Structures are given as C-alpha cells and as structure tokens.
Design a protein with these regions (language model features):
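Short secondary-structure junctions
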Residues: 12-19, 71-75, 188
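Active-site acidic catalytic loop and adjacent metal/ATP-binding pocket
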Residues: 28-40, 44-45, 79, 182-199
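An alpha-helical support segment within catalytic cores of ATP-dependent transferases
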Residues: 4-12, 141, 156-198
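ATP-binding pocket architecture of kinase catalytic cores
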Residues: 38-140
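Accessory alpha/beta interaction modules
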Residues: 1-14, 34-35, 41
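Protein kinase glycine-rich loop
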Residues: 23-26
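Generic alpha-helical secondary structure signal
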Residues: 99-102, 153, 176
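A cross-family kinase active-site recognition segment
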Residues: 83, 114-172, 192-193
Length: 199
C-alpha cells in the first residue's frame, strides 16, 4: 500500500519536528520522498517496504555511519535521528504492516543516466568508487550475507530474464556478457570480498 503524502508529512512533523514540501520519487518498492523545508534544506524520507526486514535497514544505516567515520568527505547520505535520538523507527501501515522509517540528507547533483559519458567523467566515477571501496573495508553486519539479484556474484541467476528483453541486439549483448561471466565465475569465487552494495 502506497503511503499517502499526508501521512508522510505527519511523520516528519511528529518524529523530526520539521515541516516541508514533499516530492514522491518513483522507486522499486519503498515510499521515498524528497523533503524541502521552508529554509531550503533537503532530505530524503524513506518508508521501507513491509517485506524489508529491520536488519536490512539497520545494515544500510550502519554502513552509512561507518563510511562517514572512515571518509567524512565522501558524498554519501547522512542519517538524521528523530527528535528522541532514534535513527530508524517502525510504524504500522494502514493495512497493519510494519514499516521502517528513516530520514537521510539529500545529495544534490545530476543522475548519471542524465549525463554524457566521457573519459573524464568515468575517471571521476572510478576514483569515487575506489574511495567508497576503501571506506567500506572492514565493515561487518549480521545482514551482510543477504541475497540481491544485482550483486555481481549472483549474475547468472538473472539469465532466465533474458527473454524479457524485447530488443534483439540488447538481448544478444546481455547473453554474450553472461557467457563471458560464466567463464570467470569460478575465479571470482576465489577472490577476497567485503561488503559492497553494487547499486
């Protein structure tokens, strides 16, 4: 059940003591709103899907806090606690489902899919990913072994979705990529790993 905007506004006021204009983002499964306060500050209010366990949300918050201590200048969202000092709280939705709620800072910028890819941009992305990799080194959490289809180590589990790609050229390119991956998968399993979201 999609959370009504009025409910999100009430959560902001009751738990964070703030008011502002909301813009809903289209997401895969959560209710996500950009909040713009009267003084121009921006935040992201995330209301997790009822199927998302608390441990997963805690994993994400713990990782963000860990990164902040390892590389404070790395541009990742910062967590905002409620007025009573809680970083995640649960609500009961209109259908009785439990949902986790949290407030993060909003990162200004242009989404990658709206930019032109050039060598300079790719180098900058590579540098940022390297910083993120080092900032996450050593992080552990009880939920770190969760399964995500887009995690590279599970790439072949998506092979059955190739038939869903209508464009023949794109489907062939994806198929060839999966075939190349099949040959390196064994070597990949032998590599050292640490927590990485891959999103």
């Amino acid at each position: 059940v999609q959370m009504p905007e009025e409910s999100a506004i009430r959560l902001l006021k009751d738990r964070y003591g703030m008011t502002g204009a909301l813009k809903r983002f289209d997401t895969e499964k959560d209710d996500t709103f950009r909040v713009t306060t009267e003084d121009g500050r921006r935040f992201i209010l995330k209301v997790a899907n009822p199927d998302e366990p608390f441990t997963e949300i805690d994993f994400q918050n713990s990782l963000l806090r860990y990164v902040e201590t390892r590389d404070p200048t790395l541009p990742v969202p910062r967590i905002n606690d409620t007025e009573d000092g809680v970083d995640i709280f649960q609500i009961k939705d209109v259908d009785g489902s439990q949902r986790c709620v949290r407030l993060l800072t909003f990162l200004e910028g242009t989404p990658l899919d709206e930019t032109q890819s050039d060598k300079t941009g790719r180098v900058q992305i590579g540098k940022m990913l390297a910083r993120l990799r080092y900032a996450t080194e050593g992080f552990t959490h009880e939920a770190e072994d969760r399964y995500y289809g887009w995690d590279v180590q599970h790439l072949l589990t998506l092979e059955h979705l190739l038939d869903e790609v209508d464009d023949y050229t794109q489907r062939q390119a994806l198929s060839q990529g999966l075939e190349r991956f099949r040959h390196i998968e064994v070597k990949l399993r032998q590599c050292r790993k640490h927590v990485l979201h891959n999103d």
